[in-house]
A protein has these predicted regions:
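Juxtamembrane helix-loop-helix connectors linking adjacent transmembrane helices
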Residues: 25-29, 54-121, 136-143
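Alpha-helical transmembrane segments of polytopic integral membrane proteins
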Residues: 15-19, 47-51, 82, 122, ...
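Alpha-helical transmembrane segments of integral membrane proteins, especially early/N-terminal helices
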Residues: 1-4, 29-41, 65-84, 134, ...
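Non-cytosolic membrane-interface motifs at loop->transmembrane helix junctions
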Residues: 27-35, 96-103, 171-181
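Residue-level signature of transmembrane alpha-helical entry/exit and packing/kink sites
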Residues: 4-8, 12, 32-36, 63-71, ...
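Transmembrane helix-loop-helix hairpins at the membrane interface
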Residues: 107-215
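Aromatic-anchored segments of alpha-helical transmembrane domains
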Residues: 12-23, 76-83, 157-165, 202-209
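Alpha-helical transmembrane segments in multi-pass membrane proteins
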Residues: 2-54, 66
Length: 215
């Protein structure tokens, strides 16, 4: 357990240091390339050296289909009530006048970037590489919506939210913890990062579009 703790947090801490140094000394263009590269390359390198399989990607059409189905169902469950709650939040907390439909391209245009440059690298590292290590340290003890979960699931979500603040501090970064729980759940539900990658990208693109409806 001690070895896993040192390895998981040591690798993550080193990764964040490298990303922070890149932010300080590289241009935004190169920094934008560094982040997904490290998030993909470091776990790939470690797993290759340890001769461990990359078992969190789809290995069959059936598994891919399951991931796509779980993603679609999760969107239908999560986003309608979230959108309704967020709408009233914008009206009564931020005191915007009303909802004014923004162009739908604001949602679709960033989707390829969100999938390939944001969601895939982040889910590859945090849900594919880190979360299984956390689950070995803290064995899943709870059964939630058909999935065995534990403190490893929660710790991974906390580290994910904290990592965003290390790179760029924002007051609302604490809220990243909550969708991270969904990402982690989807990974455990399907055994693959397909559903969390798609849900992650959809969430980011959706929020970019949603807030524009009030500005």
């Amino acid at each position: 357990m001690k070895k896993l703790l040192l390895e998981s947090f040591g690798v993550t801490f080193s990764l964040l240091i490298l990303l922070k140094l890149g932010q300080l000394f590289l241009s935004p263009k190169w920094e934008g390339l560094l982040v997904p590269t490290l998030l993909l390359y470091i776990p790939f390198l470690i797993l290759s050296v340890q001769r461990k399989p990359i078992d969190f990607i789809d290995h069959s059409l059936r598994q891919l289909g399951t991931g796509l189905m779980v993603f679609a169902v999760s969107i239908l469950i999560v986003f309608p009530p979230y959108m309704l709650a967020a709408h009233y939040w914008m009206l009564h907390v931020f005191h915007f006048d009303a909802f004014k439909m923004a162009p739908i391209r604001i949602f679709f245009d960033p989707l390829p970037y969100q999938i390939l440059a944001v969601a895939l690298p982040e889910e590859f590292y945090f849900r594919g590489f880190l979360q299984p290590m956390m689950n070995k340290i803290w064995k899943p003890k709870w059964h939630l919506f058909g999935v065995n979960l534990g403190w490893g699931w929660i710790v991974t979500a906390l580290v994910f939210a904290f990592a965003h603040s290390v790179i760029q501090l924002k007051w609302w970064h604490f809220s990243i913890f909550f969708p991270a729980l969904i990402f982690g759940y989807l990974k455990e539900r399907t055994g693959s990062i397909t559903a969390p990658v798609l849900f992650h990208a959809f969430s980011n693109a959706f929020m970019s579009w949603f807030v524009r409806n009030y500005f």
